[in-house]
Swiss-Prot record:
Its EC number is 3.6.4.-. This is Probable helicase A859L. It comes from African swine fever virus (isolate Warthog/Namibia/Wart80/1980). Residues 178-349 form the Helicase ATP-binding domain. Residues 401-553 form the Helicase C-terminal domain.
């Protein structure tokens, strides 16, 4: 006899998505005793068993599973409304926590004979287990919503197939992703929903098809969808293995294939095949072996969470071989195991914004509608009831708004939890609204029926849910989403926003409704706090929204307000102010360097380099979305972050941003090192003095050389020696008017270089001092012996008048004002240079265009 814990299923229960949980001392006989055969037909079968050494151990596992699945248990019955894979993982976790040894058997068939029929001794009905040990395993309805949706909506979506096309950005994404894989072995592709991540993955995995590739997806529905797409792209089923718990044969044209969860067959196929593509669910990943050249993790934000081994993290934490490619629209950075971990995930090799997909025509556009809090005719007795009544009215207002343009609109309502969904549903139905509800505690067939009714409805309808339809569910006719409770996770927000953004012919723009506890009588910044996380998430995906927040008069955005009786423009202005400065209204949250949209800021940097032939000056300005910014602040942040990245330190930059920077001319030398490189200039100085008999000849220390990328060695040396001359004698004090200039600000190593090079030729480069103070008159003019640098500058000024050919040879363009303006003459004359940033004492900022005056224009 074999004791064990089991999960059994019967067709009558399966129709309601119910599974029988139990324990026995005799697995071979259990399904044949009276409790199973009296009221049921003989169609019982095991989904799986955990064979144990004693019946008592099996009973403990059962008790633990029922405790952890309490929210999904039929009252007073050992019936659980969870998928078998979910129960299996839970049972194994319970056994491990209770230190019970077991052997897992999938779909076992035990041989029945007369010797197996024995009367089992009874055990206490409530075995002693440590619930404290198991508390972290308890499955809450909210937590299970996403995992339930992975498989429950398996037959509910029909994606329209379009002709295969390689969009330009997909080719770029595939190239950058593959290059990053070759460089570091790991890469993230962050691409907006509905922009073709699977196609990009196919282009990349095509480079690995001579070996073994693993493609992980979160659920059976996406497994089928991924297989269909890859087959459409040209993958042959001969070298494909599907690992998942659905036994339905998949037919593709004249080909067909089945999934498997047989661990022996899976391991043998992977180890023996010279080339193989395995498509598996994360839930079945524990059946795989570590022998892949490339592992693709789709919807990889689902991996993130607690730092523990579970099906979604099994491959990430335990497999050592192969390159890793991670695909997501919404990286997750707010959990202990997060995508900030570069060692595990790598960095973002390519990013494609939601706004880019909209403007390219691949994603439907949308509008934002904030919904004011209506007045209630009768004030409820509790705050909770008041909030519920307000949200119900706001939902009705939102649906009415949709009906003004759409005959039969469909709206998804996302709630805080299942409890709130049930309460809102009951209230809406009482008020005559056509409302539906779906959540993970309902049987699968009920959810599918509800979802089908929602999709096919010819009347205005809303569907309430918590997270069941937050991602991965396609409703082509969906028109709007309504946030009945604030969302704080950027991932949750963006995934929810994307639900109605399917692109269809003649489909109107979608609407995102944000209810607020604001009306014309209670306007204050605190009332807008709930939309700040939403705005932050949207601004990171939509640069146009970011620009609108900075200056709505210059950058329009489809955002409005319904249910407001006062000035809509004033309410929107307050909302924008709260988003930008916070509810305290003190700090500009949007103009920090790390918040500037990368593409816009980098485009200005690239323009400066390619058009102006230089890197930014310290006083360059930047006009973005109506904001006046000092570009040098962002530029210094970029250099600092770049050096951190190259030194393998924590950095704000992603690989695609590093690639952008390194594509610029002379980035590592002039961009990072600056226009006046010390070592390079010292080498030139040493050679120059040797060739000119120890004479510096002429040097310009007035206009500081030339910062352009095409600068001559003499122009760069001029810049270096300008800095030396300025620092020689500079005071350490903050208030220079009150302290004598006695400091020496040249770094010791640089001073040693100058002593060595000038000393060879007995040249004096330091200014004279008395008791540490510079020799100066009462007006602060230097009165000591001139240095060789000062003498060379006098010669330079003479040569400007008497030897223009010499000046043009070593300082080309000097006569045309290049050095005066620190811009190429044609750039200056055409006004193409970045504006000059100027800050005033009163806090105002101004950008002054660098443009020529008449006397500056050279004929």
């Amino acid at each position: 006899m074999c004791a064990g814990f089991y999960v059994a299923v019967h067709p009558w229960l399966e129709a309601q998505s119910l599974h029988k949980v139990g324990h026995t001392g005799n697995l071979a006989a259990r399904l044949h005793d009276g409790s199973y055969t009296t009221c049921f037909t003989d169609e019982w079968k095991y989904c799986f068993t955990l064979e144990t050494s004693t019946k008592k151990d099996a009973q403990k596992i059962e008790a633990g599973v029922l405790y952890c699945a309490q929210f999904f248990r039929v009252k007073n019955k050992e019936l659980v409304c969870l998928l078998p894979e979910k129960i299996k993982q839970l049972a194994e976790d319970v056994a491990n926590c209770l230190d019970i040894s077991y052997t897992l058997c999938d779909s076992p068939a035990y041989e029945m004979n007369d010797s197996t029929i024995v009367v089992e001794p009874s055990l206490p009905s409530d075995p002693l287990i440590s619930k404290e040990k198991l508390r972290h395993l308890v499955i809450t309805p909210v937590e299970d919503e996403e995992h339930f949706a992975d498989d429950v909506l398996f037959f509910s979506t029909d994606e329209t197939r379009t002709a295969i096309e390689d969009r330009l950005y997909q080719k770029e994404a595939a190239n950058m992703g593959y290059q990053e894989l070759r460089r570091s072995g790991r890469a993230i592709l962050q691409m907006a929903c509905r922009c073709g991540k699977t196609r990009v993955a196919y282009l990349i995995l095509s480079n690995y098809l001579q070996g073994k590739v693993l493609y992980l997806v979160p659920g059976l529905s996406l497994l089928r969808q991924t297989l269909e797409k890859l087959y459409q792209y040209g993958i042959s089923l001969k070298n494909v293995l599907l690992v998942g718990s659905d036994q339905t044969r998949i037919v593709l044209n004249h080909d067909n294939i089945e999934m498997t969860t047989n661990p022996v067959f899976i391991a043998k196929r992977i180890r023996e095949a010279p080339s193989l593509l395995v498509i598996a669910t994360y839930q079945s990943s524990t059946l795989l072996v570590d022998d892949f050249d490339l592992i693709i993790s789709d919807e990889c934000h689902r991996i993130c969470g607690e730092w523990e081994t579970r099906p979604f993290t099994h491959v990430l934490l335990n497999f050592k071989k192969g390159h890793r490619l991670f695909l997501t629209a919404t990286p997750r950075y707010d959990t202990p195991l997060s995508m900030k971990n570069r060692e595990l995930f790598g960095g973002v090799a390519f990013r494609y914004y939601l706004r880019e997909g909209i403007e390219a025509g691949y994603v439907n556009d949308f509008e934002l509608q904030m919904v004011a809090a209506p007045k209630l005719a009768h004030q409820p007795s509790t705050k909770e009831e008041t909030t519920k009544q307000i949200i119900v009215k706001q939902i009705i207002m939102a649906l009415a708004h949709l009906k003004t343009n759409i005959t039969a609109p469909k709206m998804l309502v996302f709630t805080r939890d299942i409890k709130q969904a049930k309460e809102l549903y009951a209230e809406l139905v009482d008020q005559g609204v056509y409302a539906l509800i779906a959540h993970s505690t309902l049987p699968r067939q009920v959810i599918l029926k509800t979802f089908t009714e929602f999709c096919s409805s010819k009347e205005p309808v809303i569907l309430l849910n918590c997270r069941l339809f937050q991602e991965g569910v396609e409703v082509p006719e969906l028109n709007a989403v309504f946030f009945a409770a604030p969302r704080h996770s950027p991932r949750d927000i963006i995934q929810s926003i994307c639900r109605p953004l399917n692109k269809q012919v003649q489909k109107p723009h979608a609407t995102i409704f944000l209810p607020l506890e604001v009306n014309t009588e209670n306007v204050c910044l605190d009332r807008f706090s709930s939309i700040i996380p939403f705005a932050d998430a949207l601004a990171s995906e939509d640069p146009r929204f970011y620009e609108h927040l900075l200056n709505p008069s210059e950058v329009a955005y489809p955002i409005n307000w319904i249910g407001a009786h006062g000035s809509v423009s004033e309410l929107l202005q307050l909302a924008r102010h709260a988003i930008r400065y916070g509810t305290q209204g003190k700090i500009d949250r949007l103009t920090r360097s790390e918040r500037l949209p990368w593409k816009a800021a980098f485009a200005e940097l690239k323009r400066t380099v390619e058009i102006c032939c230089r890197y930014p000056k310290i006083n360059d300005g930047f006009h973005f979305g109506g904001a006046t910014l000092r570009f040098d602040t962002w530029y210094k942040w970029v250099i600092k972050s770049y050096l951190q990245y190259k030194n393998k330190e924590p950095s704000s930059l992603e690989p695609y941003q590093v690639s952008d920077l390194e594509s610029l001319q002379d980035w590592t030398t002039r961009g990072v090192g600056g226009p006046y490189p010390w070592e390079e200039s010292m080498a030139f100085l040493e050679t120059w003095l040797a060739q000119n008999k120890g004479e510096l000849v002429a040097i310009d220390i007035h206009q500081g050389g030339w910062i352009g990328l095409d600068a001559t060695p003499m122009e760069r040396l001029s810049g270096v020696l300008t800095t030396v001359s300025q620092r020689d004698g500079r005071s350490y004090g903050k208030n220079k008017k009150l302290r004598p200039k006695k400091g020496f600000m040249i770094p010791p190593q640089q001073a040693q270089d100058l002593d060595r090079i000038f000393g060879k030729h007995n040249l004096k480069w330091r200014k004279d001092r008395v008791n540490g103070f510079l020799k100066e008159d009462e007006h602060g003019n230097y009165t000591g012996e001139p240095t060789c640098i000062q003498e060379a500058y006098r010669t330079f000024k003479e040569y400007v008048k008497t030897n223009p050919d010499y000046i043009e040879k070593y300082w080309p363009g000097y006569a045309k004002g290049k050095h005066k303006h620190q811009e190429l003459p044609h750039i200056w004359e055409k006004g193409l240079a970045p504006p000059r940033y100027k800050a005033f004492k009163d806090g105002n900022k101004q950008l002054i265009q660098r443009s020529p005056k008449k006397k500056d224009v050279k004929n």
